[in-house]
Amino acid sequence: MGRQFAGICGARGSLYGCVVCNTYLTCSKELTSKAFTGSTGPATLFKRAWNVVYGRCEHRKMTTGWHTVRDVFCVTCNQKLGWMYEMAVSESQTYKETQVIIENANFEKIAGAIKDPLGEDRQEAPPAPNLEMSRYPLEAEKKSRPQYRTVSVSSSSSAEC
């Protein structure tokens, strides 16, 4: 059986997956910071993650203050990966809200850089349209138009509709 994933959802750059089952979790474009510490050691803050399930909301005292968090688990193997910040009490910590901490021991790089299938990373400008050429020549366009005749209708008081 191959890797399970619900979707890559516009993932670009390096892909990261669960260390146990290699299920796709997130990508390097979603990375916010590597300067975090989890319960098992270093951790990484990502804007979002896919193929995860969330536990119940809990209030936890962390090194930066009180936070409302949910544990995050791999959808395939149920490995605990880290947590998601639901709410921060301190105003200076609100940037973490809705972001996901994944402990470095629980994920690994699963692929090199991938090519953007939609071409959204393209830096060059799109080609300018050629306005001199048209789909139909002007004369052919005139000939293909339906010709309508105008008919005048006089109304009389004795005419019935």
UniProtKB/Swiss-Prot annotation:
The keyword Phosphoprotein does not apply. InterPro entries: Yippee (IPR034751), Yippee/Mis18/Cereblon (IPR004910), Yippee_fam (IPR039058). It comes from the Eukaryota. Residues 117-161 are annotated as: Disordered. Residues 151-161 have a biased composition (Low complexity). The keyword Cell inner membrane does not apply. Keywords: Metal-binding, Zinc. Zn(2+) binds at residues 18, 21, 74, 77. This is Protein yippee-like B0546.4. One of its GO terms (molecular function) is metal ion binding. Belongs to the yippee family. One of its GO terms (cellular component) is ubiquitin ligase complex. Residues 14-111 form the Yippee domain.
